[in-house]
Amino acid sequence: MFRLNSLSALAELAVGSRWYHGGSQPIQIRRRLMMVAFLGASAVTASTGLLWKRAHAESPPCVDNLKSDIGDKGKNKDEGDVCNHEKKTADLAPHPEEKKKKRSGFRDRKVMEYENRIRAYSTPDKIFRYFATLKVINEPGEAEVFMTPEDFVRSITPNEKQPEHLGLDQYIIKRFDGKKISQEREKFADEGSIFYTLGECGLISFSDYIFLTTVLSTPQRNFEIAFKMFDLNGDGEVDMEEFEQVQSIIRSQTSMGMRHRDRPTTGNTLKSGLCSALTTYFFGADLKGKLTIKNFLEFQRKLQHDVLKLEFERHDPVDGRITERQFGGMLLAYSGVQSKKLTAMQRQLKKHFKEGKGLTFQEVENFFTFLKNINDVDTALSFYHMAGASLDKVTMQQVARTVAKVELSDHVCDVVFALFDCDGNGELSNKEFVSIMKQRLMRGLEKPKDMGFTRLMQAMWKCAQETAWDFALPKQ
């Protein structure tokens, strides 16, 4: 279809060109024809390329072909097939000898590239349906899809491959049994975790998924301003209705919120707060409690802590420590750095720490607390740079104590400088460091979830409107 449209457009341009060169039309018409020809060719080329990429990103059959083994092609994926649940669960549990991460093959890399495109460009509905792994069927026979906390972290972490035989609308089926499910709560979330408060087993519904991504992608300062705007009586508290307004406004400013559309056919619609376990958590069982900004920011801090803990545990720490290379991978996960440069940075890290002692979760958490104040850190580092002081490890530790009130260990600073000390002179490349760390802090959730085609066409139309009048006027 794109080829036919392109050929027809080029044919019309050729006819117009012959008419333009063969006649003696006024100068104004010729200039308009030149402008139309240029814009038409640019639009056809851009739309063909971008829509072709879009088709690849949105096409579900691709991953089915990639993730299906030859021997499994005849398997029945019926949603009511509960008999194979134990077998699927056993397949998903890693064996002790398989804990060491294998090197990704060609097929795995292609699957991860496809999943990264889903994370980057798909709607929240499709992302949720792809990375969720559980479908719970209640007693009346109605089914609802849920994410586990591990599924949630995987849905926002690049290059984390979905388990085999689970993908878009492919789930592990569970029959609802209140007693049995309450006994399985510890399988999904530790007691004291934010996820433990999310209803049954710490499972995440679609409404909770949208809310949690909104909390993770919104700076603390934005919530403080929103709470003050809707705190009409000035007592520092908001009720449930006011919180719904705060939540709706904040969500509409995020990339997830802007891309979401209710899909009744898939069951993924944003429900009101009355149905959310989070609303019960904030306002009590009778929903008549009050929520303060202090309590909400504490919830945000705990959520960030729990997500970071899950990321840490995914690396299978040995004696409570992960390797320096794994920590570097956590820092660069959302960087968007080109693959060649990323590989070079990881090799440099491996060269410096062939037999490193590793990092504890406390060291990792202290560094990410430091990153939460990255804007203030950027200002402080700029002051040091303008004053002519070198940005060495001692300076970074001083900035961490002053700005974030945390202590960075010497070993953490060694790892960071091994990544971002490009010329090996012991000084930090602060511009690249701050840029990558800002993306890491937001986990890529602030990026627009589109191919940029609409923005391109709007820019071209605006440019055409501004320049058309100049082309139409004859030169004096």
From Swiss-Prot:
Residues with PTM Phosphoserine: S122
Positions that bind Ca(2+) 1: D231, N233, D235, E237, E242
Sites where the protein binds Ca(2+) 2: D421, D423, N425, E427, E432
Primary site of residence: mitochondrion
Keyword Iron: no
Location within or outside the cell: Mitochondrion intermembrane space; Mitochondrion inner membrane
Location of Asymmetric dimethylarginine modifications: R455
Record field: transmembrane: none
Record text on subunit structure and interactions: Heterodimer; disulfide-linked; heterodimerizes with MICU2 or MICU3. Homodimer; disulfide-linked. Component of the uniplex complex, composed of MCU, EMRE/SMDT1, MICU1 and MICU2 (or MICU3) in a 4:4:1:1 stoichiometry. The composition of calcium sensors within the uniplex complex can differ depending on tissues: a MICU1 homodimer can be present instead of the MICU1-MICU2 heterodimer in skeletal-muscle and kidney. MICU1 is recruited to the uniplex complex by EMRE/SMDT1, and it associates with MCU at low calcium levels, occluding the pore of the MCU channel. Associates with the MICOS complex.
Protein name: Calcium uptake protein 1, mitochondrial
